[in-house]
Swiss-Prot record:
Its main location: cytoplasm. Keywords: Acetylation, Cell membrane, Cell projection, Cytoplasm, Developmental protein, Membrane, Phosphoprotein. It comes from Mus musculus. The gene is Spry4. Residues 7-21, 92-108 have a biased composition (Low complexity). InterPro entries: Sprouty, Sprouty_domain. This is Protein sprouty homolog 4. One of its GO terms (molecular function) is protein kinase inhibitor activity. Residues 167-274 form the SPR domain. It comes from the Eukaryota. Residues 1-28, 52-114 are annotated as: Disordered. The keyword Cell wall biogenesis/degradation does not apply.
């Protein structure tokens, strides 16, 4: 019985590994014609995939320059690595692969945390420390009204040439007797109103208001005892006949005269300005440092 003939006459090296593709029993005969490749064990490389973010976070992935269209391809530069960050391929074949990979990941995580951690607060020096507080500046509001007249010429600067009193509108206007509105601002309480109601003249005014023409009702109702205007004789005749029934109407004229006298006396006491008529006015100029006034020589 003959010994079996070996399929390959190549001696087997214990330090080498035969690498051949898996053959399927149903593969065609042409695939069996490829030669077998024998690689020594020191030339074999592992399929370890490096992660630049974990293994070496300080190095950013370098992007290769763009190749111009139609030109030869350029090789991307390989980023420089430190000796401490190089991961050898033969480490995975050692007896402790899990311990080496875990230590590498731990050191990479520590370097990543150290890189991302902010510097201590004590080492951060401010560019410029504020030692003095800003001063408060009090700004005056802008005067948008324009230049105003001097205080001594603001008002009361027109004086009468005869009596020397002020001739401004506020001082020269006549002063009336005090009056007020009563009954929910419906009735005026004044001296003349009290005379009208006390002497029953309000009744006569109401009759003239409703019985006269529309053109004359205003003058007749407001001034029933006037000697001018229309229907003067008719008005006085009617009031004379009515005074027989209402004798209080006879007191209307004396009471109205008393109100006029009281108005003049009150105006003389309360009006501070000039009461002269047809007199010239002069401009009062205040002397500097003195409260007395001096009159100008140019009246107007």
């Amino acid at each position: 019985m003959e010994p079996p003939v070996p399929q390959s006459s190549v001696p087997v090296n214990p330090s080498s590994v035969m690498v051949q593709p898996l053959l399927d029993s149903r593969a065609p005969h042409s695939r069996l014609q490829h030669p077998l490749t024998i690689l020594p064990i020191d030339q074999m490389k592992t399929s370890h995939v490096e992660n630049d973010y974990i293994d070496n976070p300080s190095l950013a992935p370098a992007t290769g320059p763009k190749r111009p269209r139609g030109g030869p391809p350029e090789l991307a530069p390989t980023p420089a690595r430190c000796d401490q960050d190089i991961t050898h391929h033969w480490i995975s074949f050692s007896g402790r692969p899990s311990s080496v990979s875990s230590s590498s990941s731990t050191s990479s995580d520590q370097r990543l945390l150290d890189h991302m951690a902010p510097p201590p607060v004590a080492e951060q020096a401010s560019p410029r420390a504020v030692r003095l507080q800003p001063k408060v500046v009090h700004c005056k509001p802008l005067d948008l009204k324009g230049p105003t007249a001097p205080p001594e010429l603001d008002k009361h600067f027109l004086l009468c040439e005869a009596c020397g009193k002020c001739k401004c509108k506020e001082c020269a206007s006549p002063r009336t007797l005090p009056s007020c509105w009563v009954c929910n601002q419906e009735c005026l309480c004044s001296a003349q109103t009290l005379v009208n109601y006390g002497t029953c003249m309000c009744l006569v005014q109401g009759i003239f208001y409703h019985c006269t023409n529309e053109d004359d009702e205003g003058s007749c109702a407001d001034h029933p005892c006037s000697c001018s205007g229309s229907n003067c004789c008719a008005r006085w005749s009617f009031m004379g006949a009515l005074s027989v029934v209402l004798p209080c109407l006879l007191c209307y004229l004396p009471a109205t005269g008393c109100v006029k006298l009281a108005q003049r006396g009150y105006d003389r006491l309360r009006r501070p300005g000039c009461r002269c008529k047809h007199t010239n006015s002069v401009i009062c100029k205040a002397a500097s440092g003195d409260t007395k006034t001096s009159r100008s020589d140019k009246p107007f």
